[in-house]
Amino acid sequence: MHEAQIRVAIVGAGGRMGRQLIQAALHMEGIQPGAALEREGSSLLGSDAGELAGVGKMGVIVQSDLALVKDDFDVLVDFTRPEGTLAHLAFCRKHGKSMVIGTTGFDEAGKQAIRDAAQEIAIVFAANFSVGVNVMLKLLEKTAKVMGDYSDIEIIEAHHRHKVDAPSGTALAMGETIAHALNKDLQDCAVYSREGHTGERVPGTIGFATVRAGDIIGEHTAMFADIGERVEITHKASSRMTFANGALRSALWLKTKKNGLFDMRDVLGLDVL
C-alpha cells in the first residue's frame, strides 16, 4: 500500500492553505506528506510540519531548500506567490517532478512558462480547486450559451482583507469561461472598474466587482441580467479544506500522467458533461 502512495511536497507550509494541505494530506487515502517548505529566513524552518498544522508530530521537518528534499516527493503542491512558484516550476521541470499549482496573479509570461514546462512534466494549474467552483464554471458555460447574447453579465467576488490580487483568479476564470462560450476574448470585453460618469453600460461587456473585507474565504457570483429577470449563479466557500482536498485529489490524478497541462475540469471529468 505504501508503494502506491503519492508523496507530496507542500510549499508555504506555514500559511493558511499550507496548514490545511498538511491536515488534508494526513487523512486522504493514497497521499503521503513527503516534504514541507517555507521561505528562506522563516522562523518556521526546522519545525515539524504536523505540529505546525496542529495535528501533532509527523516527522516531516520544514525546509527552505527544495534540493534537500528532492528525493522525498513525487508532486509539489504550490499555493504561494507567482515569483516563488516560477522558481519551484524551474526546479520541478529540471528534476521531473509533477506540480499542482493553485497560485494566482500570474502575468502572461508566467502563464507561458507554465505552458512550456508542461511539455516535459505533468501540471494541474487551476484558479480554484473546489469541486463546487468547477461545477459552477460548467454551469456558467451552459448559461452563457443560452442567455449570454442578450443579458448584461456581471461577476462579483469577495475575499478576506489579506488577498493581494484582484479580481481573484476564480473570478477571471469565470469571465474567461463565459467569454469563451460566447466566442469572445475576455481581454476585449472585460470592464474591471467603474467610477464617475461612465455613461450607459456597453452591450456585450463582462463587468467585474471586487470586495476585500474581514475573513471571507471566497464568494463568487455571476449575474445574467435581462429586462424583467436575472439568473445568478453563486458559490460560497466556508472552509479552505475544500481547496486542499481538491488540490490533493489533483495530485493523485497526476499519478498516471507523464506530462501535459491540465485543470480541475480534467481531474473531475467535467468536459464530458
UniProtKB/Swiss-Prot annotation:
Source organism per UniProt: Salmonella arizonae (strain ATCC BAA-731 / CDC346-86 / RSK2980)
PANTHER family the UniProt entry points to: 4-HYDROXY-TETRAHYDRODIPICOLINATE REDUCTASE 1, CHLOROPLASTIC-RELATED, DIHYDRODIPICOLINATE REDUCTASE
Gene: dapB
SS bonds (residue pairs): none
Alphabetized Gene3D superfamilies for the sequence: Dihydrodipicolinate Reductase, domain 2 (3.30.360.10), NAD(P)-binding Rossmann-like Domain (3.40.50.720)
UniProt entry tagged with the keyword Oxidoreductase: yes
Protein name: 4-hydroxy-tetrahydrodipicolinate reductase
Coiled-coil regions, chain positions: none
Free-text function comment from the UniProt entry: Catalyzes the conversion of 4-hydroxy-tetrahydrodipicolinate (HTPA) to tetrahydrodipicolinate.
Keyword Translocase appears in the UniProt entry: no
PROSITE patterns with a match to the protein in the record: DAPB (PS01298)
Catalytic reaction(s) noted: (S)-2,3,4,5-tetrahydrodipicolinate + NAD(+) + H2O = (2S,4S)-4-hydroxy-2,3,4,5-tetrahydrodipicolinate + NADH + H(+); (S)-2,3,4,5-tetrahydrodipicolinate + NADP(+) + H2O = (2S,4S)-4-hydroxy-2,3,4,5-tetrahydrodipicolinate + NADPH + H(+)
One GO term (biological process): lysine biosynthetic process via diaminopimelate
